């Protein structure tokens, strides 16, 4: 394989492309959340808890955010330290709820999320293309997740 073929193969690699995209998206997100004292993923968790004010279990949060339960616990611990969420025991179960302080913080969280979208719109300039790409990427991700879920169930 000559250098040109190697370069073409490298540039068309799905893993490399997705990794590059993640770095760009993550940079947009971190810049957008720089003014508030939480990271983007914590912001997404707060949005989830704001929508489900009755509280959610670690497993419910894990399923919604598609992250490991141990990661959820770490995120919740950080948000508890800041006073934005609290854990409440109900019998053997534990639920995480957004606090009044967290609810007061939500306008800042939504503004930060809007900034991320605005950065995409500014960079891409075609909102229809942005919506189509988002829908396509969501579908792509769901297909991969379904494939992985089926393989796990086989084992």
Kindly give the residue locations of the regions a language model identified:
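N-terminal helix-turn-helix DNA-binding core of bacterial DNA-binding proteins
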Residues: 23, 27-68
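Short amphipathic alpha-helical segments with heptad-repeat character
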Residues: 15, 19, 23, 66, ...
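N-terminal positioning helix adjacent to the helix-turn-helix/winged-helix DNA-binding module
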Residues: 10, 14, 41-42, 94, ...
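C-terminal regulatory/oligomerization modules of transcriptional regulators
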Residues: 1-6, 111, 115, 122, ...
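Charged, amphipathic alpha-helical coiled-coil/dimerization segments
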Residues: 77-135
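N-terminal leader segment of winged-helix/HTH proteins
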Residues: 1-36, 82, 97, 131
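A structural signal for well-ordered alpha-helices, especially hydrophobic packing surfaces
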Residues: 22, 53, 106, 141-148
């Amino acid at each position: 394989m000559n250098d040109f073929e190697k370069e073409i193969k490298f540039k068309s690699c799905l893993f490399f492309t997705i990794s590059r995209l993640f770095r760009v998206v993550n940079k947009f997100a971190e810049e957008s959340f720089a003014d508030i004292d939480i990271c983007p993923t914590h912001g997404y968790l707060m949005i989830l808890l704001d929508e489900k004010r009755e509280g959610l279990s670690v497993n419910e949060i894990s399923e919604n955010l598609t992250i490991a339960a141990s990661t959820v616990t770490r995120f919740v611990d950080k948000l508890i330290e800041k006073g934005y969420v609290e854990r409440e025991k109900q019998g053997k179960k534990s639920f995480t709820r957004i606090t009044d302080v967290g609810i007061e913080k939500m306008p800042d969280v939504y503004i930060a999320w809007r900034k991320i979208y605005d950065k995409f719109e500014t960079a891409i300039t075609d909102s229809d293309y942005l919506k189509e790409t988002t829908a396509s990427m969501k579908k792509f991700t769901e297909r991969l997740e379904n494939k992985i879920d089926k393989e796990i169930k086989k084992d």
